[in-house]
């Protein structure tokens, strides 16, 4: 049991994990998806109500067509394969990002998952796909301006984000040995505690999650106050 309401994870290191095992990048991404399946029961046991996974960034569109195509197929396969199990376990699916850039078939699969699980309340699994936080904030401001508002409040931006109901991030974990947040949930993670690990995401396990949460529990969050 933890007091974390929103855990965000940058699932980094899949390609480098594959390289260390003399495997193609695709196998690293597949191992990363398998790791989500492995750790979801632990997130449920910890009673963390909201999990966001950074799976495909807006910058990832600059990768090779082969890698992009595989990642699109992988999300489609994951949703088809895991949807019944996610639904059975009371998990609500949300997907945030510029989803209009995805194929019609993938958008349909995403919408089907969202619709099927919309009333579940044990855990919300938010998949950030074709996502960039600067783009999200830009899209929110564009939406507000289009509504005719001339004075923008903080609450207006919050309500125009991809998921207005998303709670602020408490803990942001990044495996992979990289020490940056890479345009991920900049608005929502304004006061998040950050935890970095040298381990690649496919090697991350239950004990690593527990260690990150234990480290978080020892910190004093001041939110700018003394």
Curated annotation (Swiss-Prot):
Binds 2 magnesium ions per subunit. Homodimer. One of its GO terms (molecular function) is magnesium ion binding. Its cofactor is Mg(2+). This is Isoprenyl transferase. Its EC number is 2.5.1.-. The active site is at 12, 60 (proton acceptor). It comes from the Bacteria. Keywords: Magnesium, Metal-binding, Transferase. PANTHER family: DEHYDRODOLICHYL DIPHOSPHATE SYNTHASE 2 (PTHR10291:SF0), DEHYDRODOLICHYL DIPHOSPHATE SYNTHASE FAMILY MEMBER (PTHR10291). InterPro entries: UPP_synth-like (IPR001441), UPP_synth-like_CS (IPR018520), UPP_synth-like_sf (IPR036424). Belongs to the UPP synthase family. Catalyzes the condensation of isopentenyl diphosphate (IPP) with allylic pyrophosphates generating different type of terpenoids. Mg(2+) binds at residues 12, 193. GO terms for biological process: polyprenol biosynthetic process. Substrate binds at residues 13-17, 25, 29, 57-59, 61, 63, 174, 180-182.
């Amino acid at each position: 049991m933890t007091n974390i309401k929103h855990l965000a994870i940058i699932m980094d290191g899949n390609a480098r994990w594959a390289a260390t095992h003399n495997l193609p990048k695709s196998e690293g991404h597949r191992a990363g998806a398998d790791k989500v399946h492995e750790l979801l029961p632990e997130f449920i046991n910890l009673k963390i109500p909201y999990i966001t996974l950074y799976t495909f960034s807006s910058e990832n569109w600059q990768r090779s067509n082969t890698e992009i195509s595989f990642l699109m197929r992988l999300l489609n396969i994951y949703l088809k394969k895991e949807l019944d199990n996610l639904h059975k376990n009371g998990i609500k699916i949300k997907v945030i990002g510029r989803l209009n850039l995805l194929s019609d078939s993938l958008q349909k699969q995403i919408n089907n998952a969202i619709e099927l699980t919309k009333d579940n309340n044990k855990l919300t699994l938010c998949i950030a796909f074709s996502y960039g936080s600067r783009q999200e904030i830009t899209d929110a401001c564009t939406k507000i301006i289009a509504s005719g508002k001339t004075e923008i409040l903080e609450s207006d931006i919050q309500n125009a984000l991809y998921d207005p109901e998303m709670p602020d991030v408490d803990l942001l974990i990044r495996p992979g040995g990289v020490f940056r947040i890479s345009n991920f949930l900049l608005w929502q993670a304004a006061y998040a505690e950050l935890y970095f690990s040298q381990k690649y995401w496919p090697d991350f396990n239950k004990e690593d999650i527990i260690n990150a949460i234990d480290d978080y529990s020892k910190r004093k969050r001041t939110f700018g106050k003394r």
